[in-house]
């Protein structure tokens, strides 16, 4: 954004000087010098903070904060329950898709050590745009026509498409297709290396979220009867969240029961 502002500023200054006609020969040179000065200042300003995780806002090493996240399309139907690796995600977006169901985009800053992540499903345009905002490497299996025409075929996102690239996903035997497509941490690393995608953010990338860096106040649920149970929406799968006073977390339920991770049985919170 700052680079774009610098460019617009330089163009505006050049136009003003040319149409103002003071010293005709000096105007282009002045515009060039001022544009260069603005660009130099911009370069100094766009070095992003690398002391915090860009997905959680929590303290992180420079290496951890510089690593690009992986965004994985996860199915959210009863036929695909339980999901695997869902509680390891730092950020989860839930959007509606066709047929009155929803689907997840799970974003991971650290996806290591998992033998099974899924079930993986196809992309929609708005999921892919969200992955772009996070500078994520996008894992999915196929997608809508709009996703291919407007994003994937134009190379706007680094994506690992199981419909096109084989070898980094597998079908499990515990459920029927198409609800049984999974991947693993090692498989993701392998396909990223094979496709030659960068694994670190550019120095100027500052993240998609803004966090309060100086929050010394403990967050509590004061007189939280009205917020003890939160109903997200009434459509299928009718999820709701229940506040746990002991750990200060909201635990998710859907399909009439706790939403758990198939890896270890932990509940989504």
Where do the model's predicted regions map?
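Positively charged n-region of N-terminal signal peptides that target proteins for export
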Residues: 1-10
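C-terminal motif of bacterial Sec signal peptides marking the signal peptidase cleavage site
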Residues: 16-20
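Bacterial signal peptide processing site
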Residues: 22-24
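A surface/extracellular/periplasmic glyco- and lipid-processing/surface-interacting theme
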Residues: 35-93, 98-269
